[in-house]
């Protein structure tokens, strides 16, 4: 598949105005994401075309990070967990040795599994996960805990890989003939018999159309009514500080590219596990669009709304 993801650091350009050309055309509507610490990100708002942006470095601005989108560095998850009193544990080592962290939040007989970064570059899902966890801590779901795995492709995350369409297959096509340690660990947790839901958090394609929105990928005809109910409750739970969401952008099974029959993805594999009431993918845009522009704060707020929608839709 096409490789649209990029990130780099510029040193020693203080006082200069520089134009960056990213062929063949992978610059978002609002320019590059810009950071000085890999934690706080803003848009440059200087896209000159679909393939370029400019940046004027301040007189003392000697070290700047630029990226396709607002990255979510693993250190942010650890800092978030520390501030919230969450113990981060070691799930396993990835295939190249990178530790894969996870956290169990709350207590209860039932388990909600949150996964992100099956595709290494899809950082928006981690902001959503952070918001879900934050909302849960304020208002737990009775007798239900959360197992959060923020970096399934941990090797790819630390290497700066895009991760999608790896060969022989990527992490979200690994649930039958499993070769990745992180996926193997998810399958083990999901098979423990106590899982209520598996919520897999992704980012879509680079840009345009539905990719500028937030949308759910529904994957089960049998659970279609439950997933549509969740969508309505999620939409009703959206607050002014969150990204906009409408069920009209969701995609049903058998529509457009959502036609996979094999259970190779996380949500399609987990939907058939006995006891699992909901398993689906949430796709969260990298950029948004005018009037609905992605920011770190808005993504986290959207995660809070997501959990509220889940809570309000749960008939189980």
What are these regions (language model features)?
Residues 74-77, 122-124, 290-291:
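Short helix/loop capping segments that flank catalytic or ligand/cofactor-binding pockets
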Residues 8, 18-20, 32, 146, ...:
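Hydrophobic beta-strand residues in large extracellular and virion-surface proteins
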Residues 88-267, 271-288:
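Active-site/substrate-binding loop(s) of hydrolase catalytic cores
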Residues 47-97, 106-107:
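Extended acidic/polar, glycine-enriched regions
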Residues 1-60, 64:
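Extreme N-terminal flexible tails
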Residues 14-16, 26, 59-61, 72, ...:
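Residues that cap or initiate secondary-structure elements
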Residues 289-316:
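His/Asp/Glu-rich mid-to-C-terminal helical/loop segments that flank catalytic regions of hydrolases
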